[in-house]
């Protein structure tokens, strides 16, 4: 068996076309979605990622801006910028690029974002809504994973899913989304014993811990769906996933590559949530 490759680049491209059509329809009503991104400091990876978000937003007809603060910016300065964006009626969605410098509390900043503009889905209010099945902004990587699975017509009802990683950014929210689709979910983490035992029984595996080579061919049963969220740069700067891709694709039923799998879907869901934010505040959703 050779796995079906879940091509995040192509799926994202098709999805963005649908978003672009919706943006154009909104513009005809007099509304243009706007995404504002706060970047503190000059981390190369963060700067590159923020620029790619801006470019993607503008490509589908949105307005986007980067609010770039110095590495030495105080917490108060960051919070003041957030307050300005919260109160700016032209801004549909706000996200703060992490990590933040040590003098700025990430939690305090995330909690200061207006929940109605929180397109990353990290505000406690939106996290809470997710867990009681209310409409809300869902964190973008988990949302992108679910769209990949949906696009591939993967039926999750009654399936055994194993999620490796329990972060609030990926592991926990994607587990909740899988449960919403009636999967039976097991979460593994650094204290879990005999991970291979659980992996071998899984119909779906989502690995999101950033440990290259963690999931091997021997861990995966034939026909399983494998979603690799890992993107760790090696000594040459090449991104490596958590999964031994070349080996695992020989037994898996479907698999995401790294890069080009989950990554493009994450940025696409930032755009999706920005559009949703604009629709909701205009009473159109």
Swiss-Prot record:
One of its GO terms (biological process) is tetrahydrofolate interconversion. NADP(+) binds at residues 165-167, 190. The keyword Amino-acid biosynthesis applies. Its EC number is 1.5.1.5, 3.5.4.9. Keywords: Amino-acid biosynthesis, Histidine biosynthesis, Hydrolase, Methionine biosynthesis, Multifunctional enzyme, NADP, One-carbon metabolism, Oxidoreductase, Purine biosynthesis. GO terms for cellular component: cytosol. One of its GO terms (molecular function) is methylenetetrahydrofolate dehydrogenase (NADP+) activity. Catalyzes the oxidation of 5,10-methylenetetrahydrofolate to 5,10-methenyltetrahydrofolate and then the hydrolysis of 5,10-methenyltetrahydrofolate to 10-formyltetrahydrofolate. Homodimer. This is Bifunctional protein FolD. It comes from Staphylococcus carnosus (strain TM300). The gene is folD.
